[in-house]
């Protein structure tokens, strides 16, 4: 089996937009932890346009947040792709629809007087939308992430690191990585097949020097730690040639266009909804994190070598309408028994998820580059001993 996954640097135009959307979201949550927001960003040709819905749009300095985000990434000149100091900023922010707000605030169960409906009941809040999400975990890395996307993220992060630390001072913010691995008959990663790096750079740098420097300073340190067989690997560094014009001046950016980069690469399914710019009442956010949290606990309990968790919701309903798991033939117990144990131990109602994972905090800009999963700075990446013991006991 061959598996390929890609990542992008924080200066990629789409990732720039993800970070702007989530930086604004963090600012909104700082002012009101119960705020509702759905923020989209477009960037291109020296213009940044943010639009969407926010429950308290006047509470934050949106232009100031946008400029700081752009500058912190490293876009300080139009020659690099955009200048955070001088770019044009346009806003089209409105309040959330009352109908949507009511559906979230007063669930179908609450309106029909079903279930536990006491004060502050988790059944009162409904899902902010319909849809399905997928969570995944496996034994390929200590982080329980697929190895191809893990390596791709490390390469992309390393590109930004050597740029910011001026180890390779001629690099500019835009960049991408891609990793192809070969798997053995037991579906374990075995060989490194191909690495692709595309790095934006200043016009003055020699292309051969750039290729050598990136191979030695970025690629080899990351790859050497994997233990993969690299004897037949192909390394393609800036295979298209020079990459001087980059960032939003070369390709327009848009929030939500790197959803596979954000999750598990090509190793798992994706429900199609983007995460960035959305407050935790949105199912693409709370349910995606919950699905990952559950998947990690199943693998940590040694009930499966890998698992994909699917959760589906209806707008305005607190309880999921469907739940499914796939252990790819690696489960150590019957799937029906495992599924029942998961549903017994974990509460999938939106308010319960938000409470369990402490999601009403300004944590979201950090998620918007180098993956939402695989980093233990996030609550959904941490194994809860009580939940793990309960899961073990439930089977």
From Swiss-Prot:
Cofactor binding mode and count: Binds 2 divalent ions per subunit. Binds 1 potassium ion per subunit.
A Pfam family matched in the record: S-AdoMet_synt_M
Domain of life: Bacteria
Keyword Transferase: yes
CDD domains for the chain: S-AdoMet_synt
GO MF terms, alphabetically ordered: ATP binding; magnesium ion binding; methionine adenosyltransferase activity
Main location as per UniProt: cytoplasm
Functional pathway: Amino-acid biosynthesis; S-adenosyl-L-methionine biosynthesis; S-adenosyl-L-methionine from L-methionine: step 1/1
Catalysis performed (reactions): L-methionine + ATP + H2O = S-adenosyl-L-methionine + phosphate + diphosphate
Subcellular location: Cytoplasm
Keywords, ordered alphabetically: ATP-binding, Cytoplasm, Magnesium, Metal-binding, Nucleotide-binding, One-carbon metabolism, Potassium, Transferase
Top EC category: transferase
Residues holding K(+): 40
Residues where Mg(2+) binds: 14
Record carries keyword Transferase: yes
Entry's EC annotation: 2.5.1.6
Residues annotated to bind ATP: 12, 174-176, 242-243, 251, 257-258, 274, 278
GO BP field: one-carbon metabolic process; S-adenosylmethionine biosynthetic process
Gene3D superfamilies: 3.30.300.10
Its job: Catalyzes the formation of S-adenosylmethionine (AdoMet) from methionine and ATP. The overall synthetic reaction is composed of two sequential steps, AdoMet formation and the subsequent tripolyphosphate hydrolysis which occurs prior to release of AdoMet from the enzyme.
Protein name (record): S-adenosylmethionine synthase
Organism the protein comes from: Tropheryma whipplei (strain TW08/27) (Whipple's bacillus)
Phylogenetic placement of the source organism: Bacteria, Bacillati, Actinomycetota, Actinomycetes, Micrococcales
Name of the gene: metK
């Amino acid at each position: 089996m061959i598996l390929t996954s890609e990542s992008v640097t924080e200066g990629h135009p789409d990732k720039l937009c993800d970070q702007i959307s989530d930086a604004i979201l963090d600012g909104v949550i700082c002012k009101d932890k119960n705020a509702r927001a759905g923020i989209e960003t477009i960037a291109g040709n020296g213009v940044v346009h943010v639009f969407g819905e926010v429950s308290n749009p006047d509470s934050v300095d949106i232009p100031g947040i946008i400029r700081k985000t752009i500058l912190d990434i490293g876009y300080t000149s139009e020659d690099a792709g955009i200048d955070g100091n001088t770019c044009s900023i346009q806003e089209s922010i409105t309040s959330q629809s009352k109908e949507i707000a009511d559906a979230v605030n007063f669930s179908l169960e609450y309106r029909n007087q079903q279930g536990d409906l006491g004060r502050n009941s988790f059944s009162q809040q409904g899902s902010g939308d319909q849809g399905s999400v997928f969570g995944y975990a496996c034994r390929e890395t200590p982080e329980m992430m697929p190895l191809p996307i893990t390596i791709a993220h490390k390469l992309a992060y390393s590109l930004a690191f050597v740029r910011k630390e001026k180890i390779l001072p001629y690099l500019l913010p835009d960049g991408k990585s891609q990793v192809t691995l070969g798997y053995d008959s037991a579906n374990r990663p075995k060989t490194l097949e191909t690495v692709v790096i595309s790095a934006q750079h200043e016009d003055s740098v020699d292309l051969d020097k750039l290729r050598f420097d990136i191979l030695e300073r970025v690629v080899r340190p990351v790859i050497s730690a994997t233990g993969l067989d690299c004897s037949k690997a192909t390394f393609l560094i800036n295979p298209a040639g020079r990459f001087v014009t980059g960032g939003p001046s070369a390709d327009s950016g848009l929030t939500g266009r790197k959803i596979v980069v954000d999750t598990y690469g090509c190793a798992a399914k994706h429900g199609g909804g983007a995460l960035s710019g959305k407050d935790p009442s949105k199912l693409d956010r709370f349910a995606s994190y919950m699905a990952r949290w559950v998947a990690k606990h199943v693998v940590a309990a040694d009930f499966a070598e890998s698992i994909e968790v699917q959760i589906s919701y209806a707008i305005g309903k607190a309880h999921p309408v469907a739940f499914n798991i796939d252990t790819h033939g690696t489960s150590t117990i019957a799937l029906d028994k495992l599924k029942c144990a998961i549903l017994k131990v974990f509460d999938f109602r939106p308010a319960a998820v938000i409470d369990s994972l402490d999601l009403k905090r300004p944590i979201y800009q950090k998620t918007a580059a180098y993956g939402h999963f695989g980093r233990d700075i996030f609550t959904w990446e941490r194994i809860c001993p009580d939940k793990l013991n309960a899961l073990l006991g439930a089977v």
